[in-house]
């Protein structure tokens, strides 16, 4: 079995709501604050207390901070994390969340990732929310996260660059490929930080899976509505393979260039397709052609059918709903002589069935060390199989 967490975002998600919910779930607030104070931050104090939100007792967070620097560069935050003594998985998860926000800001403002200067996200409270949340997840031993569809609210919000519609530009960019739930509330329900947590750490989105519930935590948002403005987190033991249905969309193409086909596949995957691939086939008149197969969530069927009709030369598509069974996924960080590598595990009843290092981490190490990719891959794989063993329970 593996410890997993379900984020029930019926009222949206924000960094402070998640951290509060994790403390309500059982994370130790004193230990979180102690770990955070190992970072070179201005003086601060965390205050967690219970508050009633429309009849629901939920945890809230207030941060007392004496801050001199509201705006930090992305490299400053990364260096602060890298130089710390935080656990490796906390470092990895924290940097991944900051990277997602930074990439979104870079795209919106038309600059490189290195040029991004964090505003709200660079402020102390957001740094505490992100890194503190990752510390809490580590305390609780959470390996895998799942999440409901996420509501954003609607209306307008005043941000650093002026008045913008909800969701804010960064939030909308981060939520690409994530299912959005409609909730008719004129207010911001999901922040960039909350969206980045979901984008970076959640394995899959949808209803609560078949599982044994262990603990439940409630984190309260700062706003008051006529409904409980809370994030509910549910810790459970994931015992079996995940079973669900997906949509398979196909078409045949005989008049597109390889460049155009490559562009479509990259675009579809960026938009949230679960998978896409091409198969060489022969069509009528003995023409060598290509069959496009795209796999997506059931609720994304209409969107990707339209994308295929819009972006390819095909005049039609075929769609089929199919059942699939997948192993439970979990991630751990492996420390190597070259740096840290994220390891993906496939679990069945808590036992390791598959394990492999993440390609992007290996690629980054190969580029940094200027060693052949295969050399790095083999070294990491050797250490991986010395550390973990197929058939053992993942601890």
UniProtKB/Swiss-Prot annotation:
Signal peptide: none annotated. One of its GO terms (biological process) is protein maturation. Its EC number is 4.99.1.12. The keyword Lyase applies. Disulfide bonds: none annotated. InterPro entries: Ni_insertion. One of its GO terms (molecular function) is nickel cation binding. This is Pyridinium-3,5-bisthiocarboxylic acid mononucleotide nickel insertion protein.
